[in-house]
Every structure is written in structure tokens, then in C-alpha cells.
Amino acid sequence: MKLIFTFLLFPLLTATQPIINCKEVIKPYEDFQSPLAFEETVAALQKTLNSKGITIFATIEHHKAAEAVGESMSPATVLIVGNPKVGTALMQENPLLAIELPLKILIYEKEKTVNIRYEKISATAEKYNIKQNFGTAEKIDTAMQQLIKLSIGKLKN
């Protein structure tokens, strides 16, 4: 009897697993390849972001931190950026989202290629069940993607 019950119950238990998750609905990252050298890419991004009123809260140079402790790694810098005038609405809807903000942009070099990875706030907003201000998250992503392209010469001003 227990064996029959187990066979009948198994399909019900496996059916409760989610069919899709956030990562399948919205790609959580946007990746770009920079034609510029690593340091030039970082400087160009900083200049573009500053010129558009985006605050750079921090610049984390992982490769320099590694060097400081006698380790080595390929160049990798994270820019922590944002505009409180825009991002605050998301946190007002769900204060837990504050742990994910400000936005992050990773510039890294791999196999002599400079890459940029932007963590999309719309994917994060979906994870935190942002509904009322989801359009704001999408607008932030569009603006950030355009600013990244502009900074590396892949979009005309």
C-alpha cells in the first residue's frame, strides 16, 4: 500500500517545482565587448556616467587589491553607480531591494579582451516582486545599456 501511495504522490510532488525562474524570463546580465584598453574603458565609463548625472559611489579595483596581498589576477574593476532620484521608487515599493542597490558594472579583461557586464535591475526587481515600478527598472536598464555603449563608442551621442 505504501508503495502505491508513493507512486501516486510522486507526480504531485514533482509538479510543484517551478517551470521557469527569473533568469529564464529576464537575462540577469547584459554583456558588452569594449574596443578600448582596460584602463581606457574604465575611464570612459566613469566620464560618461558622471556627465549624465550618475553618481559613482565606489570603484573597486579587484586586481589592485589582489596585488596588495601578493596575489595576481586579470584586471577587474566594479563601478557601483546610481541615481537616488530614480532608484528610490524601487526601494519604496520593496525595502528589501535596497540590499541590491546601487547598480553594479563590472569591467574585466579575459584573454586580452576587455568586457563589460551590467547587472540588470529589471531582473532583480522581478526577483523582489516589484510591480508598480517595474517600468522604472526597465527604463534604468535601457539607459544604462545606452550609456555603456556610448562610452565605448558603440552608440553615437
Q: Can you annotate each of these PLM segments?
A:
Residues 122-157:
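C-terminal partner/receptor-binding element of secreted or periplasmic proteins
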